[in-house]
Amino acid sequence: MLSLFSVVFTFLALFLIPGLFISRRLNVPLSLTNILRFIKIIASKYDDEEERNEKRGTMGEKQKRGRNIMPKHVAVILDGNRRWAEKRGLGTSEGHEAGARRLMENAKDCFAMGTNTISLFAFSTENWERPEDEVKCLMALFEKYLASDMPYLRSDKIKISVIGNRTKLPESLLGLIEEVEEATKSYEGKNLIIAIDYSGRYDILQACKSLANKVKDGLIQVEDINEKAMEKELLTKCSEFPNPDLLIRTSGEQRISNFFLWQSAYTELYFPTVLWPDFGEAEYLEALTWYQQRQRRFGRRV
């Protein structure tokens, strides 16, 4: 049985002292009804805070799970440089310069978020049909940024692979490509693939010719040709993850334009309207959020 002292002490601690404080702070008359009302409000606020904390915890868990669903290979079609320049009253070359600056910035963001391979469609086979001055500008930009980015590539141990038909490339650019590839060939874990004079159809044709020559030379039998054998001949064999999980094409155009035709069989395709020079970290995070909400079935029923 509680003593009288205990009862009085409990009353003072739980009701009277808080009641006096409430009465003075809120300028309300002291009464048991007001004290109980205040206690009910505090309890309600505490419950609301608990509920918010629980929701935050749930969101945090979802974000953690989302980070585990990162694309291993992200491919990007860099589109919108000219339109970006036109909107600002600038020349085409200035648009390409802005796009070239954005290239390595976005690659850094991708690697920082856990992606292993990044493929950039920088110059298609069809791009040779553009005005001569524009083509020369693009070739000069490739040389400029390959050279200037070398310190970063080495310090961050990023392997560079340039894929495509090299027969038309300027000698100076070819020499630089070979130098960069040689300097970074031993790096593992991060692979930056730059497609220059690349065509998905060309890639498939050269792979088929290579397999045909191996059959002709007696190195393999026709029966040995399967998907794995084909993938070993494609230009993306330079990567541990040759098939993109996510392909992004900026500028709102919704086609892959002869890029990675074989490799994109089950790739998630994302088409933001933002132009390439404006595609930054925030836009990439939006692409990742979209990707993480996709249910990838690979032709199976899940």
From Swiss-Prot:
Pfam families reported in the protein's UniProt record: Prenyltransf (PF01255)
EC top class, as a word: transferase
Record-listed E.C. numbers: 2.5.1.-
Source organism (scientific name): Arabidopsis thaliana
UniProt xrefs under HAMAP family: ISPT (MF_01139)
Location, primary (coarse class): endoplasmic reticulum
InterPro entries: UPP_synth-like, UPP_synth-like_CS, UPP_synth-like_sf
Protein name according to UniProt: Dehydrodolichyl diphosphate synthase 5
Family matches, as NCBIfam families: uppS (TIGR00055)
One term under GO cellular component: endoplasmic reticulum membrane
Record Gene3D superfamilies: Decaprenyl diphosphate synthase-like
